[in-house]
Amino acid sequence: MLLAEELALVAINPSSGRHGLGLRAEINACLAGLLVAELILDDVIAPGDKTGRVAITGRVEPKGVTLAAATAVVIDKGPKLKAILSGMDRGLSRRIGLGTWDTTVAGLADAGVVEATSGGVRPRNNLIQGFVRDSTVAALRHAAAGDGALDLRTSALLSMTGPAKLLEVVAPDRKARGHARNRIDHALDGTVLEPIGRLVRRLISEAVAAAGAATVAATS
């Protein structure tokens, strides 16, 4: 399962089959970050000559349609990570007909973990293999509650639960959320994936600020 698919699965509420209301932009940014992280971990791309840039290695082919499309976005929008992350949703849609969220849940549906998308205004993906989500959530809770070093895949996934607004899922005990938030915020510190975590958060902050400014302008 791709890192982005794992995050999408955690974001799906088992009761509704949907992610939290109004969180698509935040989740899409995090999914884009995880797709790029996956490409780095697979050695399809590597950090570039400057911070915040990446380059195709030419050593490894991307695995599967989703990562192949994500690689095409990297080639088209790169080398700057910010442009790649900003363009991922539209880039995937242009290449495979699905945006970032729909691409990842389609992968989950193909694997039999969730049902195919259904519904109109607010589509849903009911869980089929709830134990898969339970296992992923349990691993994230263990990582968030601990103090030890994490492998890069776990670090990447844990890092994105913060900006994806999944803290309450990862740390259901309110008293433990301070520690969990610290683990999430610093999960990628000093790693090759740190620029991705930083830029995802920046993009979300900029989008929130722009939306706030637009609201003020519309009401003034």
Feature map (PLM): residue ranges:
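Hydrophobic/aromatic-lined pockets within catalytic cores
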Residues: 12, 40, 44, 109, ...
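Acidic, Ser/Thr/Pro-enriched low-complexity segments and adjacent helix/loop capping patches
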Residues: 85, 90-99, 111-127, 131, ...
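Leucine-rich, amphipathic alpha-helical/linker segments
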Residues: 73-107, 146-174
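Accessory beta->alpha helical hairpin/"wing" motif in late/C-terminal subdomains of nucleic-acid enzymes
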Residues: 49-72, 115-145, 151-157, 174, ...
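Charged/polar, solvent-exposed surface patches and flexible loops
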Residues: 9, 69-73, 83-86, 90, ...
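Short hydrophobic helical membrane-anchoring segments positioned at the boundary
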Residues: 141-220
